UniProtKB/Swiss-Prot annotation:
GO function terms (MF aspect): ATP binding; ligase activity, forming carbon-nitrogen bonds; zinc ion binding
Catalytic activity, as annotated: 7-carboxy-7-deazaguanine + NH4(+) + ATP = 7-cyano-7-deazaguanine + ADP + phosphate + H2O + H(+)
Function: Catalyzes the ATP-dependent conversion of 7-carboxy-7-deazaguanine (CDG) to 7-cyano-7-deazaguanine (preQ(0)).
Protein name, UniProt field: 7-cyano-7-deazaguanine synthase
Cofactor(s) in the UniProt record: Zn(2+)
Gene3D superfamilies linked: HUPs
């Protein structure tokens, strides 16, 4: 019987690759997505497609209104999504999003008896979010083992971030080898209802540059 793992699945390029890698590692993957009030809801439809295509045992979508707090261009329509690189942490950072998602994954893992959680964060070709850094992942794993019944009873809980030190091109090559159909993923911060990308935001830039560096055709559909 395969061991269970929780895989955080946004519907984007990175999380799809993380799911494929977890499956390749021999886990029965339970995919978890978060409907947090993001403007790019097309990624949730993409997550459902990817969970099915990549053999997830189960896919759940948790609704949690982080958008009620605002504070991010991804949850507040009055804040424009930047279309050029900015210094510092950009307004597309969603406060505590990865912390909340990992906490939900941890709760589900305890219920299922899973000891492994996968998250597709990256600290090489990324937008500079503080909750994508290795220090954060390491700290959350320590907390998980202190704050759970499983951890206190001696079961080692592990937070896997297999993409953390890979370039976007390396991620794309890895996922392609594992059968990820990147045409089904949505990365754009302001994708339209059909999942077509704007081609101008930071997520689109990183994705486009990644395919270019990988020497592979970019399957992204653009709105214009």
């Amino acid at each position: 019987m395969k061991p269970c793992a929780i895989v955080l699945l946004s519907g984007g390029l990175d999380s799809a690759t993380a799911l494929a890698m977890a499956r390749e590692a021999g886990f029965a993957c339970h995919a978890l997505s978060l409907d947090y009030g993001q403007r790019h809801t097309a990624e949730l439809a993409a997550a459902a497609r990817l969970a099915a295509q990549l053999g997830a045992v189960e896919h759940r979508v948790i609704r949690l209104g982080l958008g009620d707090f605002g504070g991010s261009a991804l949850t507040d329509a009055s804040i424009a999504v930047p279309e050029s690189p900015v210094a510092g942490i950009p307004v597309t950072y969603v406060p505590a999003r990865n912390t909340v998602m990992l906490a939900l994954a941890l709760a589900w893992a305890e219920v299922l008896g899973a000891r492994d959680i996968f998250i597709g964060v990256n600290a090489v070709d990324y937008s500079g979010y503080p909750d994508c850094r290795p220090e954060f992942i390491e700290a959350f794993e320590r907390m998980a083992n202190l704050a759970t019944k499983a951890g206190v009873e001696g079961a080692q809980l592990r937070i896997h971030a297999p993409l953390q030190h890979l370039s976007k091109a390396e991620i794309i090559h890895r996922g392609t080898a594992l059968g990820v159909d990147y045409a089904q993923t949505v990365s754009c911060y302001q994708a339209d209802a059909e999942g077509r990308a704007c081609g101008r935001c930071d997520a689109c830039r990183l994705r486009r540059e990644g395919f270019l560096a990988a020497g592979l055709a970019d399957p992204t559909r653009y709105a214009r």
